[in-house]
């Protein structure tokens, strides 16, 4: 009996010691996790309702092909799905129908005729969103309160003045201190959102002339999305191990491949580029330009001369 009681005491002491040991270890692990720079999770945001694109702003042959004429508006996700499921092979490469019916630049067509379909440079399903976006065009005008307004990049001031003259928007003299402030009604906001796929930045239906000008500048800016980009120097391809194709005096690679290669050089904890990468690109990218992936992409490439084909 005594031996049994001693065993109980021994087991009790061992349990307390074991608990203390594990508690200390767990505390050490927690401290290490707290002090380590872990990438912060982005706060989940409420999903915004998807904008419907007016049928008249979608490529007419595409609308007819898929019987979308009677739609009140076409979701971009539907366009993406139709492009992916009808213009690509089972291997995920752009098929011959897609080459004829989707909007491609002349350079893109030349590259497709040069590289093999098995090449990573060939257009594939990773390019669906770019191809789908090209099927919609920017609005050139909108109607409001019986007036027709034209959207032209070099005549934005005239547009704003005309909106004021027609009383479609009103100058708010009380709020106009450093900048002219305008009252913009909900009905006009809805029209602009429908025709340009984005809303002006307003607060309590008030918007400054600067923000309104910037808004019209953005919605009238031509879409410059590219599948292929021109590298500034052939050495960039070697540094990033990129597949390339030469067209005349220019060396092209896929925009997505270049972006992925640069993104892989970002440290997941510090969210900064690796030091070795800084050294490799120092000749092409100034130190103050190394702010993010998209900026580095701009510094390593030459602006494309876009000549569209199959557009309407």
Swiss-Prot record:
Species, as recorded: Variola virus (isolate Human/India/Ind3/1967)
Molecular-function annotations in GO: DNA binding
Stated name of the protein: Telomere-binding protein OPG077
Assigned protein family: Belongs to the orthopoxvirus OPG077 family.
Keywords: DNA-binding, Virion
UniProt xrefs under Pfam families: Pox_I1
Gene name for this UniProt entry: OPG077
Top-level taxon of the source organism: Viruses
Other notes: Each virion contains approximately 670 molecules of OPG077.
Location relative to the cell: Virion
InterPro entries: Poxvirus_I1 (IPR004969)
